Amino acid sequence: MKYTTEQLEAIASKLRDMPQVEKKKQEHSKQEAVRVLSKEIAALQKRGYTLDQISETLRGEGLSIATPTLKSYLQRAKPTKKAPVQAPGDTPPPAPAVKKPADTSKATFTPKPDSDDI
């Protein structure tokens, strides 16, 4: 099907006149919520609060989470340690010599029949 210029202009006009769509409020799982709140939780721990006290406060705010679950989610939220980065100018240690596998091109194998019948 082919479209005329007038049809395309009418379609474009309707598209331009469409109202702005409201963005949905982003919803998070409990694990994502703990990840988002992990800095605040770590600050509370530094101030002497226990995970029991923190999880109780979270439950009071509507985030029902058990203390062991909170601990587990916090451990998952920690950034993984990356390999150390070398300083500029440092040369990496020489790679260990790699031994070549033995030449097996002249090897032979003669299969022998099984002595036990299955």
Curated annotation (Swiss-Prot):
Region of interest (Disordered), ranges: 75-118
Record keywords:
Plasmid
Instruction: Please identify the protein, giving its name as recorded.
Output: Protein MobC
Q: Which organism is it from?
A: Acidithiobacillus ferrooxidans
